[in-house]
From Swiss-Prot:
This is Large ribosomal subunit protein bL33C. Belongs to the bacterial ribosomal protein bL33 family. GO terms for molecular function: structural constituent of ribosome. GO terms for biological process: translation. The gene is rpmG3. It comes from the Bacteria. Pfam families: Ribosomal_L33. Signal peptide: none annotated. GO terms for cellular component: cytoplasm; ribonucleoprotein complex; ribosome. Gene3D superfamilies: Ribosomal protein L33 (2.20.28.120). InterPro entries: Ribosomal_bL33, Ribosomal_bL33_CS, Ribosomal_bL33_sf, Ribosomal_zn-bd. Keywords: Ribonucleoprotein, Ribosomal protein. HAMAP family: Ribosomal_bL33 (MF_00294).
Length: 49
């Protein structure tokens, strides 16, 4: 079962990226390294409920 999730960078509060994940295969929170235009570098974005 795939669900849509939002990715947020905790320090800057940016919520830029939308993606989907399979809850059965990844039950814990997803963390992806993405580009932050505000900081102009790659940082870790974490799944937000």
């Amino acid at each position: 079962m795939r669900v849509n999730i939002t990715l947020e960078h905790k320090e800057s509060g940016e919520r830029l990226y939308l993606t989907s994940k399979n809850k059965r295969n990844t039950p814990d929170r997803l963390q992806l390294k993405k580009y932050s235009p505000k900081l102009r570098k790659h940082v870790i974005f974490t799944e937000v409920k």
